[in-house]
Amino acid sequence: MKSVASKLLLGFGLVCAGLVLFGLLTFYNILSLEKIVADTANINRAIVELAINQAGVLVAVQNKDKSLLSSSVEGLRTSLDDIKAYQSDFSGENLKLLQESIAHLEEMIRITDSLIVDGVDQSIYDRFVELQAEIRNPLRKLVQNLGVENVSMTKNIKRNIIFFLVVVCAAAMFIAIFTTRNLTTPLKKLAVLVENLSHGVLNVEIEKIRSKDEIGKAAMAVEKLREILLDIITGINKASSEVSSSSEELSATSEELSANVNSISEALVSLNKEADENSATLEEFTASIEELSSTADSNSKSAQAMLESTQRVHEQVEKSTERIREITEKAHSTREMSENTKQALNRLLSMAENINSIVDTINSIAEQTNLLALNAAIEAARAGEAGRGFAVVADEIRKLAEESKAATQQIGEILGKLRDEINNSSKIVESTASAIEETASLVESIKDVFESIRIAMEDVQSRVESVAASTQEQSASLEELSAGVTRLTELLNKTRENTSSANSALQEANAALEELSASAQSLAELAQELQRRIEFFKI
């Protein structure tokens, strides 16, 4: 755990979780107990209602009361429906007992329906009485079983309550002891460390602490402080010794520095003269660089304009290529549609041939019908007056056959024209498909040309970009060079100014060196006082 709060919350959470689990289990057991009690009440109520309705049947039979018998039978049916509804609440032996009572109750209702108040069959009456016990006994056995389950469930609830109370109390005690040890152990170690620090003991480390909470972090922080103090005091002790010895060397060194200051002053005068000469040369060089920079900037702008033009051309080529690709797809689609149209025309031509065959058949039938009509007319003429009616019918059949033949001839002519039109349409579709194929081939060629143009434009664009980048780099390099020369000129001017200032400062430094010698003596005395105070700490 990384914090005291998390440890406390964990302990409290575990206890709460145990209590919640205990509550849930108790609640579940109580619900089960309530279900058993409710089932027992339902069965007892059913037993009472059955007894009332059965008694009503017996009274109705004895008193020959049809109305009472009808209401009692209806009550038995209601009880049967209620008991059937209870089946979902039981299982195993209890369910078998309930089903046994239901079967006997159904038999009782059937027997009751056959009872006649005015003349009761004694065997039916006796069977009714027997069924009362057969219905009641399983229900009573079921109530006894529910009572046993109730007692068993109550004992289980008591055992569970005692068990969980013991477990929760033991867990709470364990968590309390564990949490207390985790909190107090690092506090004791921290107290020892702080006491040592208060007495100046820096060379004793804290005992190892495994806790990573706020107390552990505080202990580690104090231990880190001890280490830092130990390093600081050790460093101060060492530094004070070094300062004491260095102060003597500083006094001797200050005298040597005074002699060197005079030599440096003479060198600065010479450096000032050379700076004046270099400044004039750099001004001429700056003018040349500015002229080159102007030319490079003009080249960069031209290359950039050319790059923009090539980019626009490349975009137009991309758009044209995409448009050609769309045209190619549409050409392929149109070619497929032409092929489908040609196939449809071929099917239509085949259908026309089939219709023509059917028309020929109809024409043949019409001719045969005409011959039959002629034969019938001849036979009617032979029959004389008796065959006159038959002759009229034969004449109508002949006319109908001739009209059918004329109609089939017209249909044949129409089919012939339709066949010619279909053949012409098929030829046109074939010509169209051929033209579309040629167009698609031409578009593919154009697409290849545009693809070559696009590749060439990409190459040109790449080369122009390279030129533009080179001119920009050249322009940037010249600008940097110009800026560098300007800075160098400024530096020479500042150097000239600084050498003058440094010369006067060196004169002042010479006087300061004398004061430094006196300060070195005071520093040695302070180092001795610091050494005496550090002796309080044990390192």
Swiss-Prot record:
The chain crosses the membrane at residues 8-28, 160-180. The keyword Coiled coil does not apply. The keyword 4Fe-4S does not apply. Residues 181-234 form the HAMP domain. It is a multi-pass membrane protein. One of its GO terms (molecular function) is transmembrane signaling receptor activity. Belongs to the methyl-accepting chemotaxis (MCP) protein family. Chemotactic-signal transducers respond to changes in the concentration of attractants and repellents in the environment, transduce a signal from the outside to the inside of the cell, and facilitate sensory adaptation through the variation of the level of methylation. This is Methyl-accepting chemotaxis protein 3. It comes from Thermotoga maritima (strain ATCC 43589 / DSM 3109 / JCM 10099 / NBRC 100826 / MSB8).
